[in-house]
C-alpha cells in the first residue's frame, strides 16, 4: 500500500490582499524541499476570513483559480484550500458544472466559501462549505454547500471540509458501505480563532477517533483585519487519536508521510465502525480521481 506525502502550510495572511497572499504562498510552496504530493492551505487563503464577498469574490476563471492551476502544474502537486467564489449555483466536480461556472455571471449570483482540490493536470474537485459561521455573519453573506467532496488519490480516499464544519460530526461521519469505510483521511482548512482553540484541538482528535482515520487540520496564525488572533494549532492526528504534529503561534511548513497500512491495521484490530448505526447523509458527495 502506498504512503501519501502531505504538506501543511500554517501561515499569517495579508488581510484582503490577494496579490500579497498568493505571492507569499507560492514562495512557501517553492521552499518545500521534501518530496510531497498534497499541499494543504488554510481557509480563504487568498484574503483571510472576510465578510466582503461583493468586493473580493472571483469566478472559477479568476486570479486564485488560475494561480492554483499554475502552481499545481509547475510543482506537480495536488493543491487544496478555500477561497471566496462568485457563482450562480453550488459547485459540482463535473464537466457540466465546469462549463457553467466558466461563463457564470448569471442571476442570481451566490457567494461561496469554496474549497478546491486542484490536480496537476488542471482537473479539480469542488466543495462549498456546508456550515456557515453565523456568529461572524457568514450565513448572511455566503450560500451553504449541499454536497460533500471525497477525493481519491493513490488508493486513498480523502474527505475535504472547511473550518466550522468541524463542529458537526454527522457531516463527517463514515457512511455505511459494503466495501468498508468511506474515507481514510479527513482534512479541515480553517481560520479558527485562538479564543476557541480548545474546541478546535479536541474536536480534531474526536473526528479521528470516531472515524478511524487520519485527520489534518490546517489553520492560519496572526491577527486578521478585525483584530482577532489566530494561534494556528494546526494538527495531524492518527486514527487512534495520537497527535503526530502540532504547531502553535508561529508559521510553519511541515511534511508527513501517511501510512495506509497503519489505518488498515487499526480498523482490522478494532473494527468499531462495523458496529455503527446505519444511516446516510442526504447526498453521496463527489469523487475526484488521480
Walk through the language-model features, giving the residues of each.
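Active-site catalytic loop in hydrolytic enzyme cores
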Residues: 58, 70, 89-90, 99-178, ...
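Extreme N-terminal starter segment of soluble prokaryotic enzymes
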Residues: 2-8
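Short polar catalytic/cofactor-binding loops
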Residues: 10-15
Amino acid at each position: 500500500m502506498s504512503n501519501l506525502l502531505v504538506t501543511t502550510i500554517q501561515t499569517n495572511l495579508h488581510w484582503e490582499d490577494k496579490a500579497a497572499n498568493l505571492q507569499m504562498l507560492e514562495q512557501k510552496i517553492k521552499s518545500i524541499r521534501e518530496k510531497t504530493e498534497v499541499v494543504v492551505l488554510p481557509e480563504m487563503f487568498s484574503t483571510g476570513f472576510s465578510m466582503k464577498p461583493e468586493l473580493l469574490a472571483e469566478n472559477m476563471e479568476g486570479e486564485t483559480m488560475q494561480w492554483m492551476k499554475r502552481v499545481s502544474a509547475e510543482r506537480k502537486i495536488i493543491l487544496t484550500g478555500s477561497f471566496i467564489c462568485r457563482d450562480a449555483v453550488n459547485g459540482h466536480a463535473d464537466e457540466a458544472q465546469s462549463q457553467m461556472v466558466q461563463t457564470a455571471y448569471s442571476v442570481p449570483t451566490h457567494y461561496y466559501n469554496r474549497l478546491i482540490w486542484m490536480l496537476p493536470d488542471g482537473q479539480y474537485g469542488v466543495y462549498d462549505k456546508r456550515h456557515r459561521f453565523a456568529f461572524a455573519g457568514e450565513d448572511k453573506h455566503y450560500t451553504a454547500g449541499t454536497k460533500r467532496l471525497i477525493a481519491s488519490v493513490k488508493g486513498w480516499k480523502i474527505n475535504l471540509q472547511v473550518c466550522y464544519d468541524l463542529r458537526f460530526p454527522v457531516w463527517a461521519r463514515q457512511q455505511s458501505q459494503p466495501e468498508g469505510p468511506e474515507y481514510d483521511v479527513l482534512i479541515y482548512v480553517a481560520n479558527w480563532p485562538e479564543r476557541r482553540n480548545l474546541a478546535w484541538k479536541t474536536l480534531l482528535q474526536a473526528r479521528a477517533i470516531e472515524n478511524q482515520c487520519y485527520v489534518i487540520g490546517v489553520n492560519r496564525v496572526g491577527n486578521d483585519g478585525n483584530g482577532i488572533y489566530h494561534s494556528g494549532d494546526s494538527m495531524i492526528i492518527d486514527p487512534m487519536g495520537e497527535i503526530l504534529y502540532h504547531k502553535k503561534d508561529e508559521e510553519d511548513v511541515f511534511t508527513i508521510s501517511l501510512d495506509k497500512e497503519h489505518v488498515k491495521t487499526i480498523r482490522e484490530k478494532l473494527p468499531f465502525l462495523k458496529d455503527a448505526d446505519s444511516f446516510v447523509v442526504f447526498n453521496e458527495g463527489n469523487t475526484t480521481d488521480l
